[in-house]
Amino acid sequence: MADIYRFPKFSYEDNGTVEPLPLRTGPDKKAIPYIRIIKVGDPPKHGVRYLDLLLLGFFETPKQTTNLGSVSDLTEPTSYSICGSGSLPIGVAKYYGTDQELLKACTDLRITVRRTVRAGEMIVYMVDSIGAPLLPWSGRLRQGMIFNANKVALAPQCLPVDKDIRFRVVFVNGTSLGAITIAKIPKTLADLALPNSISVNLLVTLKTGISTEQKGVLPVLDDQGEKKLNFMVHLGLIRRKVGKIYSVEYCKSKIERMRLIFSLGLIGGISFHVQVTGTLSKTFMSQLAWKRAVCFPLMDVNPHMNLVIWAASVEITGVDAVFQPAIPRDFRYYPNVVAKNIGRIRKL
């Protein structure tokens, strides 16, 4: 059983909405490219910006031709068929140009893709034709990038391993950063277990403009019967001295003094941002890696939900602080479904 504190609406209503990507097609029945920029923090209105970019598009394979060996093979452009959709996160860089120049450079990229496997399935991106607007990101683009397949591809099983695959960029998601920089809570701190402590988790409720059931993301009904999605993130631990009694009022007062402000960004698809505008205890501040603004990309928190809603309209409709007993340190975490050292199973 957990106790809940509901944050007031003003804490998320200003920047808690993301507009959808418009899916429009041209005369060739192909999607018209579009760039969507959202601001997090207080970035400058003009001039140099720090932009985090996520390229969205389609995985395509060459269509099989029936007139092999004809002269037309040399003159006609290769046609492609779509085999899936996905994304390519290219990170943060300092950008000087316009949005349309950036969109043109992104759609002109030649990106080849390979599906492979390590400990899990991976997608390999190799990039060519990097235009001048993308030079701030060229260090990453030229080296090639590898990502967890379940984070960047909606259906990685649809990508063939015996055919050439290209990634055609159609949309660009950009997050313009101001004083709020991208700071993630380190995994070691997020997994921290302290005795005699209360875990402070945030339950974020979203409303989206698309139906998600057919893609495997089941909504829940709120008190008004509206369909909502939700996810949880870990903020930190509240610890009291031995002998002190925890109470809901004590935990709520700690949270209220932080004066948290919430917003949505487009880092990795959809991202949840938390800014501390009030006071923090030293213990809590250390758990936030001494940052007053942290980012939770949904790509890391709930990859499948992120893949389904990253092009849709998304709105925060509620944020709750959930106070739960911290997981005891002697509880073991099992990241694998196969138990080791049992029967014939031995750890390599």
UniProtKB/Swiss-Prot annotation:
Location(s), subcellular: Virion; Host cytoplasm; Host cell membrane
Post-translational modification: A large portion is phosphorylated in the cytoplasm, but not in virion. However, this phosphorylation is not essential for virus replication.
Residue list for modification Phosphoserine: S70
Gene Ontology biological-process annotations: viral budding via host ESCRT complex
Keywords: Host cell membrane, Host cytoplasm, Host membrane, Host-virus interaction, Membrane, Phosphoprotein, Viral budding, Viral budding via the host ESCRT complexes, Viral matrix protein, Viral release from host cell, Virion
Record membrane topology: Peripheral membrane protein
Domain of life: Viruses
Matching Pfam families: Matrix_Paramyxo_C, Matrix_Paramyxo_N
Stored Gene3D superfamilies: Viral matrix protein, C-terminal domain, Viral matrix protein, N-terminal domain
Keyword Cell inner membrane: no
Chain ranges for the short sequence motif YLDL motif as given in the UniProt record: 50-53
InterPro entries: Matrix_C, Matrix_N, Matrix_Paramyxo_C, Matrix_Paramyxo_N
Molecular-function annotations in GO: structural constituent of virion
Keyword ATP-binding listed: no
A GO CC term attached to the entry: host cell cytoplasm
Domain notes: Late-budding domains (L domains) are short sequence motifs essential for viral particle budding. They recruit proteins of the host ESCRT machinery (Endosomal Sorting Complex Required for Transport) or ESCRT-associated proteins. The matrix protein contains one L domain: a YLDL motif.
Subunit structure comment from the entry: Homomultimer. Binds to the cytoplasmic regions of F and HN proteins. Interacts with nucleocapsid. Interacts with human alpha-tubulin and beta-tubulin. Interacts with host ANP32B.
Family: Belongs to the morbillivirus/respirovirus/rubulavirus M protein family.
Function: Plays a crucial role in virion assembly and budding. Forms a shell at the inner face of the plasma membrane and concentrates the HN and F glycoproteins. Acts as a negative regulator for transcription and replication by sticking to the nucleocapsid. This effect might be regulated by the cytoplasmic interaction with tubulin that dissociates the M protein from the nucleocapsid.
Protein name per Swiss-Prot or TrEMBL: Matrix protein
Organism for this UniProt entry: Sendai virus (strain Fushimi)
